[in-house]
Design a protein with these regions (language model features):
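Glycine-rich hexapeptide-repeat left-handed beta-helix
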Residues: 2-177
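Terminal amphipathic alpha-helical/low-complexity segments used for targeting or macromolecular assembly
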Residues: 100-400
């Protein structure tokens, strides 16, 4: 029944039994039980619980909520189950779904059935706010930090799942037909509109990640020829290919984790200091390894051979990236607007008229356009558009 907690966890009032609590696993409520599961960057709503006992062979089951997954009040999951990264769980789920390849989803229960809404959390203002707040809430003071935490929302770890998720959704559409009202996946149901939106959301996020990586790689260099661009795009290392994993906050290529495990098993790595040094090296080289992975995905996603890529191809990718970034930011902006709707003002202006309610709301919450999060989103649109335009200007004169 012992549990393992990593940095910046908060286990106030609630109950934890046999859990692996990665960084920022947070529960604040007396009625909350976290049991026999792996969690990280997780916020448990009041009354959330899980069962690891199906009254047959004892409490032998377990489950995983991947990084950033969170639960609403009174949610319930019957283990074994696996919830994809940055997903939201609402209601009671008893069908043992594995949604690890459909990250950023909603799992909503309707009449004892799990309905899955893939990718929708990508446009949620709550997801963006979470990603911004975690680094600010890191309370560690010691410069020698024992937990290596990568806060990136989009990384090879989540984008690899989106590639798989996109393929899964396209295959469901092909097999069951484009006109099906409901699709079945992993004992969950997906509505037709949700499936099509899911494909679109994942493609937007992939455009955003790969575009970001390319812009970063080509930053600050004046290129004269296409060959110079190709040479710069070539990765610095082979490390980073293949699958990536989240190791309690550290995002790293699985090949490097396997190499460390092999070293521990054969005795060449036999000190805690050496293990920590390996984790430190992976963390420090994250962006080098990330580029290796992204470079090889350019061909898969854009159908371009990096050996023959041209400045015009890069400009096409950057324009798609600009559309993705601005499109996603606009969705987040619209989602934030809901927090300033009339229905959100209902609890304000205790005894007053409609106008006093609105006035009280504005005194407490401010108005929409001057909200710090909203102004940050608008600034982000401006900055990213300028960043893309700068690269286009730098390479558009290169001859084919």
């Amino acid at each position: 029944s012992d549990s393992l907690f990593f940095s910046n966890c908060q286990g106030e009032n609630g109950e934890a039994c046999a859990i692996f609590a990665g960084p920022f696993t947070v529960t604040h409520h007396k009625s909350t039980l976290l049991i026999a599961g792996m969690f990280s960057f997780m916020n448990a709503g009041s009354g959330s619980n899980q069962s690891n006992h199906m009254y047959k062979l004892g409490p032998i089951h377990q489950g995983t909520m991947e990084r950033g997954a969170k639960t609403t009040s009174d949610s319930y999951i019957l283990w074994p189950a696996r919830v994809g990264a940055f997903s939201l769980v609402m209601g009671r789920h008893v069908n043992h779904a594995d949604t690890s390849n459909l990250p950023f989803s909603y799992l909503i229960e309707q009449r004892n059935t799990t309905y899955l809404v893939p990718g929708v959390n990508l446009r949620s203002v709550g997801t963006i706010r979470d990603a911004q707040k975690w680094p600010k809430r890191d309370k560690r003071k010691d410069p020698n930090r024992l937990d290596y935490i990568n806060y990136n929302l989009l990384s090879p770890y989540t984008i690899q799942k989106m590639f798989k998720g996109r393929s899964i959704l396209k295959e469901l559409k092909r097999v069951s037909g484009e006109t099906s009202e409901i699709y079945s996946y992993q004992s969950a149901k997906i509505k037709n509109s949700s499936l099509n939106n899911g494909i679109r959301f994942y493609e937007i996020a992939i455009h955003k990640f790969l575009g970001n990586s390319i812009i970063k790689r080509l930053e600050g260099i004046n290129f004269q020829t296409n060959e110079e661009i190709r040479q710069r795009l070539k990765p610095d290392t082979e490390i980073g290919l293949g699958e990536w994993v989240d190791v309690s906050g550290l995002i790293a290529p699985k090949s490097e984790i396997d190499r460390l495990l092999d070293g521990i098993e054969n005795g060449t790595v036999n000190r805690l200091k050496s293990i920590n040094a390996s984790f430190a090296e992976m963390h420090e080289n994250y962006y080098t390894y990330e580029w290796t992975w992204a470079y090889h995905k350019i061909q898969e996603f854009y159908g371009l051979n990096p050996e023959t890529i041209t400045a015009q191809d890069i400009i096409g990718i950057v324009k798609a990236w600009q559309q993705a970034v601005v499109g996603l930011d606009k969705m987040v902006y619209e989602d934030a607007k809901k927090e300033f709707s009339l229905s959100s003002m209902t609890g304000f202006g205790a005894d007053g008229s409609h106008d006093e309610m609105k006035l009280d709301f504005e005194q407490v919450r401010g108005d929409f356009e001057s909200n710090t999060f909203v102004t940050a989103v608008l600034k982000h649109i401006e900055d990213k558009t300028a960043l893309g335009n700068e690269l286009i200007k730098r390479i558009e004169a290169i001859e084919l």
